[in-house]
Amino acid sequence: MHLPNGERRLPQRVDLTEGAAHSEFAEALYISLVTLGTLGFGDVIPVDPWIRLFSPIQALTGFALLTAALSWFGQIYPALGRRRTLSIRVHLLEDNGYVETLREPEASTGNRLLEEVAASITEVRVDLTQNTETYYFRETDPRMSLAASMPYLQNLSVAARDSTVREIRADGELLQSALDDLARHFSTQFGLSGDSTGEILDHFVRDHGHAVQKET
């Protein structure tokens, strides 16, 4: 239907400017997409009262979904970044034979490396509490996988607690406490089974597709 001002009208639904296609389904889809996308209307203007009421509701829904998606990505990627950083750091320690260094009688006590590793484990545990879905992210690169680095973390803890240097033993106990807390969280939150911290962490390693390889 042509109007005097050059527009056409879909009866009791929307107004169309001259040249716009007349398709019930296409126009309904168009209205929904531009509203959900918070883009605004161009050549289609709702005139039906119910459509005019529903349009801003759709716009609010679209804006809420967009905000939620951006917030989700903003939370997930920093958490994954911290976990990957810890994993790479542990692999670098393994590459440089840090367990053997801890076993030396003259091992240095002037660094806080084990404390920093324990603090990073605690951060990962908090991230898993706040963003439980990050547990299910698998890494294709083993050096960025916390599960792949877990056996060496346990070796670090054992070597530090067996050290003849009191300060290193204290740092080893701190590291083990962080691993114990992480294992408890794995057990209660994600149902990983085991009678000890080591068994639960080994379950985590296998759950992420890696082999359990620990020093004897």
Positions of predicted regions on the chain:
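Outer-pore turret/helix-boundary of cation channels
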Residues: 1-30
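Short, solvent-exposed secondary-structure capping/transition elements
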Residues: 5-9, 66, 82, 162-167
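Soluble C-terminal extramembrane regulatory/interaction domains of multi-pass membrane proteins
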Residues: 94-216
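Pore domain of cation channels
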Residues: 23-86
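Residue-level marker of positions within ordered structural domains that often coincide
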Residues: 6, 34, 62, 78, ...
